[in-house]
């Protein structure tokens, strides 16, 4: 991944001067370049500088020059061999001092000598290796004489002991070799000694202080240990260098004791002592320049440096393969593990590796960890940290005497309606495999992504020792309607009164008399087809809210909604008609809602009025008035003559006082939707009744599956209001759709909450609409499919208000039979538009408009596409038309009419005619062209179809009366026997109606 070239020059890309460490003292900073390789062949060269520790002179003054003995001990040992003439120093134009040039010259000479020695060793045969080592040991023992001088003080490295001039290097002298450990004798092999030039120390000039380079680290003088501790893998890009330690000061502690190389073996972490790279740069090893192998030939140097003895018995055990592969760079003050299988073509660790272009050992190809470790084929793959931890945990459990099962932590697991196995395992903090195993033991084969229901999930969580909290999507509805109010916050509110009864009994006329209005004259057909809400202010200032409900049978849902939101029900019964079916239905709705009933006997001004009959008929439905000892109030009124209205209002107020109606106006509003419609100019308009709280402009309202911000509040007279208090009916504008009548509405805190509620309700509505309708039984469904097909009449219904559309749909559903039914493609409130016409064309359905009209564009499109649009103002007419169409779709009934019987006396075979039956008519008449069947022993054998041949004697006749004989021939049936009975009959088709 990186190349390094430490040549002492700044080589920033682009010719710019790189960032450098300041101040830059001579010899204190070494710079180099690192070439980084990335994927897709991209590379980048960066400049790296290494700052070495600077030495400081003692406070006493100049340091004394080292003696000759000191120089002999601390001079770097060079391999024995013929001395080579030193090169002439380079000119001063290279920017180097004399000491640096001398150090560079020595490093180059040493590298050349080591290269020559390596090539010589490669050429020697394996048989001469032991002899060469024995000769080397013998020569080392001869030169191991201890020096006569006392132990020397720390001496400068080779770079500090450079000569002042090339002429001072003329006197070569052999270096003292360290004392090696004894080895078995072997065949001696002569080896020429290689003398090395030694230069006298440089003399300091007048007024100058001679500075020494840092001495080798003496921490390695501690006794070695055989305890093996695996090292942490070091970074191969570690830029730490050797010998970065200040020289030892000459103080009162005396001279440094001599090295103890003779009485101990080399340690694993011994540092190299060979020549350093130029400028003291970082020593790096790579796959092309690896560390020397243990036990192999070494370069010149001390016991731990190049050329020193091999590691003896005191060395620690071999480092594991994984750790050797991970350790890429030397650590300060420590040696480097060496692989025994590495060849001896290793350079001196102290020599800087050249990265010049065209080098013979230049790295090629992709750089990998295996290539850096030197064993690209056999290196083991590094284990992950989690794998190592698990292995250590298993080892620890084995030492403890077996694995101990970890205690499970009980948690509260939240389980929705449906959940996957993987999600359940995550919530229980358990592996998914454990959950799958448990389910397999229960006989359930599931995968990690399979979905299970909440009951199964609860069983699994309980089995694993957790507590379960079940949640559902319906929980979003919680808190929609606020909590109950405290009694201290309640204030009196107006009563809500619903007027109910049979059609044409005078409900709307009674309300007109109370409100002094004329609503009846504006209604189509004189009947109420919408539910109306009005608030009447009485003479004493009190207010009463009235709900006018339709009396037609189709508006049963409207009457039920009116009874559910009301406080008091006024049951209007005509004195001349008495109790009718819708009157009974209104009584049932009032009882179901638990609302008290006030009976208003209307039309008492008519001549045939009989209030007593009405009271007696109500007894059959458990309505006992006060005159008969009951609790139900009864008032005789006349809406047209305005008779008894004051008594009716007095009874309403009395009943409201008994009920003690109260509400809290200082809270968010909620209530019920009474009616909804789609207005062309105002959009969706909903009529609501506030039950609690105060509804204000700007509130965010959720009603059913619709929501919106209230843009306007309108009363029944079209006046705008700023707020609506409890028991006030108002129209609200601003909803995004028309809610269903009867849906509760409430004010929510923000739009996010409103969207959450409406999206859930819309999703539930879609699921219900898409769910198939369950049949009574599988047998019935199969019978319908096999015997006959249900005929459907597709229709599209558009009404002025949502309640009317709902009533029409309910009425058409009641017309359905096993053979025909009306299929509602679309129903809603609003005018007929182009989208409705296109939908009707695609479905082949007519459009039924109730109190609405189609726009001009929709009419033109319907004429072009051939779509039928029918308009209705009265619900009776619409239902009757649809009933007639459905009746025409019914298959006619075939009615059988008996004509007569004829007994077969004898059967004859006639040529070209076949078998002919001679018969006598025993009953009725036998006619030609009628249908006949063969009856044998009172069992119908065959339906023969139409009788085509009937003869009396030899003449063709149309009919034969009873008591006469005739002959009959049948095509396709020749098995006529004497004694058979031929039954003659006719089939008639009769139309049916619903």
Swiss-Prot record:
GO terms for cellular component: cytosol. Residues 602-605 are annotated as: G4. PROSITE patterns: G_TR_2 (PS51722), IF2 (PS01176). Keywords: Cytoplasm, GTP-binding, Initiation factor, Nucleotide-binding, Protein biosynthesis. Residues 1-405 are annotated as: Disordered. The keyword Nucleotide-binding applies. It comes from the Bacteria. It is found in: Cytoplasm. Residues 501-508 are annotated as: G1. Residues 76-91, 132-146, 158-172, 189-204 have a biased composition (Low complexity). Residues 298-310 have a biased composition (Gly residues). Its main location: cytoplasm. Residues 1-10, 28-40 have a biased composition (Polar residues). The keyword Glycoprotein does not apply. PANTHER family: TR-TYPE G DOMAIN-CONTAINING PROTEIN, TRANSLATION INITIATION FACTOR IF-2-RELATED. HAMAP family: IF_2_B (MF_00100_B). One of the essential components for the initiation of protein synthesis. Protects formylmethionyl-tRNA from spontaneous hydrolysis and promotes its binding to the 30S ribosomal subunits. Also involved in the hydrolysis of GTP during the formation of the 70S ribosomal complex. Belongs to the TRAFAC class translation factor GTPase superfamily. Classic translation factor GTPase family. IF-2 subfamily. This is Translation initiation factor IF-2. It comes from Phenylobacterium zucineum (strain HLK1).
């Amino acid at each position: 991944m990186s190349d390094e070239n430490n040549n002492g020059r700044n080589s920033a890309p682009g010719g710019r001067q790189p960032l450098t460490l300041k101040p830059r003292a001579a010899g204190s900073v070494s710079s180099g370049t690192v070439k980084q390789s990335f994927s897709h062949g991209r590379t980048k060269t960066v400049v790296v500088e290494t700052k070495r520790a600077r030495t400081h002179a003692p406070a006493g003054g100049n340091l004394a020059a080292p003696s000759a003995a000191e120089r002999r001990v601390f001079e770097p040992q060079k391999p024995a061999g013929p001395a080579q003439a030193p090169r002439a120093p380079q000119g001063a134009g290279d920017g180097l001092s004399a000491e640096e040039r001398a150090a560079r010259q020595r490093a180059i000479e040493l590298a050349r000598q080591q290269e020559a020695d390596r090539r010589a060793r490669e050429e020697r045969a394996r048989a001469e290796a032991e002899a060469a080592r024995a000769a080397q040991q013998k020569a080392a023992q001869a030169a191991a004489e201890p020096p006569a001088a006392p132990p020397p003080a720390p001496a400068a490295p080779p770079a500090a002991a450079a000569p002042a001039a090339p002429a001072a290097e003329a006197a070569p002298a052999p270096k003292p070799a360290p004392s090696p450990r004894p080895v078995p004798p072997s065949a001696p092999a002569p080896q020429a000694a290689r003398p090395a030039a030694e230069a006298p120390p440089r003399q300091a000039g007048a007024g100058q202080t001679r500075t020494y380079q840092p001495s080798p680290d003496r921490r390695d003088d501690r006794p070695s240990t055989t305890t093996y501790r695996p090292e942490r893998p070091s970074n191969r890009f570690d830029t730490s260098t050797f010998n970065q330690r200040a020289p030892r000061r000459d103080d009162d502690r005396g001279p440094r004791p001599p090295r103890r190389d003779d009485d101990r073996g080399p340690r694993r972490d011994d540092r190299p002592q060979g020549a350093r790279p130029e400028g003291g740069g970082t020593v790096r090893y790579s796959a092309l320049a690896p560390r020397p192998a243990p036990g192999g030939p070494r370069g010149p140097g001390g016991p731990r440096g190049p050329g020193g003895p091999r590691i003896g018995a005191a060395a620690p055990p071999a480092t594991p393969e994984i750790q050797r592969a991970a350790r890429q760079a030397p650590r300060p003050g420590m040696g480097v593990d060496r692989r025994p299988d590495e060849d001896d073509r290793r350079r001196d660790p102290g020599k800087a590796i050249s990265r010049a272009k065209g080098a013979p050992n230049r790295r090629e190809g992709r750089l990998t960890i295996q290539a850096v470790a030197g064993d690209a084929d056999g290196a083991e793959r590094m284990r992950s940290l989690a794998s190592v931890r698990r292995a250590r945990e298993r080892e620890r459990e084995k030492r403890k005497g077996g694995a101990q099962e970890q205690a499970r932590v009980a948690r509260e697991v939240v389980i929705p309606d449906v959940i996957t196995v993987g999600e359940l395992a995550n919530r229980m903090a358990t592996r998914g495999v454990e959950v799958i195993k448990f389910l397999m033991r229960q006989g359930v084969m599931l995968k990690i992504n399979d979905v299970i229901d909440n009951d199964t999930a609860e069983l699994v969580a309980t089995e694993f020792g957790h507590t379960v909290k079940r949640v559902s999507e319906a929980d979003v509805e919680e808190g929609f309607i606020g909590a109950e109010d405290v009694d201290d916050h309640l204030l009196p509110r107006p009563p809500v009164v619903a007027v109910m009864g049979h059609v044409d009994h005078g409900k709307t006329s009674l309300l007109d008399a109370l409100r002094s209005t004329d609503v009846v004259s504006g209604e189509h057909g004189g009947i109420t087809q919408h539910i109306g809400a009005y608030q009447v202010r009485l003479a004493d200032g009190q207010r009463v809210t009235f709900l006018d409900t339709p009396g037609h049978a189709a508006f049963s849902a409207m009457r039920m909604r009116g009874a559910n939101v009301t406080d008091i029900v006024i049951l209007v019964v005509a004195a001349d008609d008495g109790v009718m079916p819708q009157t009974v239905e209104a009584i049932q709705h009032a009882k179901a809602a638990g609302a008290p009933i006030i009976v208003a006997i209307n039309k008492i001004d008519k001549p045939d009025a009989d209030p007593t009959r009405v009271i007696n008929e109500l007894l059959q439905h458990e309505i006992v008035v006060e005159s008969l000892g009951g609790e139900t109030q009864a008032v005789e009124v006349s809406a047209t003559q305005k008779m008894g209205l004051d008594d009716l209002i007095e009874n309403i107020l009395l009943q409201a006082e008994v009920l003690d109606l109260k509400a809290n106006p200082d809270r968010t509003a909620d209530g019920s939707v009474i009616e909804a419609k789609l207005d062309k100019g105002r959009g969706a308009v909903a009529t609501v009744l506030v039950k609690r709280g105060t509804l204000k402009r700007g509130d965010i309202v959720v009603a059913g599956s619709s929501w919106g911000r209230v843009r306007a509040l309108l009363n029944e007279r079209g006046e705008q209001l700023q707020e609506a208090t409890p028991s006030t009916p108002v129209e609200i504008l601003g909803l995004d759709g028309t809610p269903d009548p009867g849906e509760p509405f409430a004010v929510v805190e923000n739009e996010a909450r409103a969207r959450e509620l409406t999206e859930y309700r819309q999703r539930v509505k879609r699921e219900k609409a898409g769910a198939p309708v369950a049949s009574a039984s599988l047998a019935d469904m199969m019978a319908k499919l096999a015997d006959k097909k249900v005929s459907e009449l597709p229709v599209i219904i558009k009404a002025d208000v949502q309640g009317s559309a709902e009533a029409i749909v309910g009425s058409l559903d009641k017309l359905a039979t096993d053979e025909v039914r009306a299929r509602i493609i679309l129903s809603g409130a609003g005018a007929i538009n182009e989208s409705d016409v296109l939908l009707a064309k695609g479905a082949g359905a007519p459009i039924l408009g109730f109190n609405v009209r189609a726009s001009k564009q929709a009419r033109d499109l319907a004429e072009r596409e051939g779509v039928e649009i029918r308009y209705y103002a009265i619900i009776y007419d619409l239902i009757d038309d649809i009933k007639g169409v459905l009746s025409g779709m019914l298959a006619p009934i075939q009615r059988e009419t008996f004509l007569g019987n004829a007994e077969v006396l004898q059967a004859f075979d006639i040529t070209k005619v076949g078998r002919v039956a001679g018969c006598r008519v025993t009953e009725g008449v036998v006619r030609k062209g009628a249908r006949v069947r063969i009856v044998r022993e009172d069992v119908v054998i065959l339906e023969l179809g139409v009788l085509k041949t009937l003869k009396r004697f030899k003449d063709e006749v149309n009919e034969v009366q009873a008591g006469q004989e005739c002959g009959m021939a049948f095509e396709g049936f020749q098995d006529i026997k004497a004694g058979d009975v031929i039954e003659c009959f006719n089939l008639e088709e009769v139309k049916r109606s619903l």
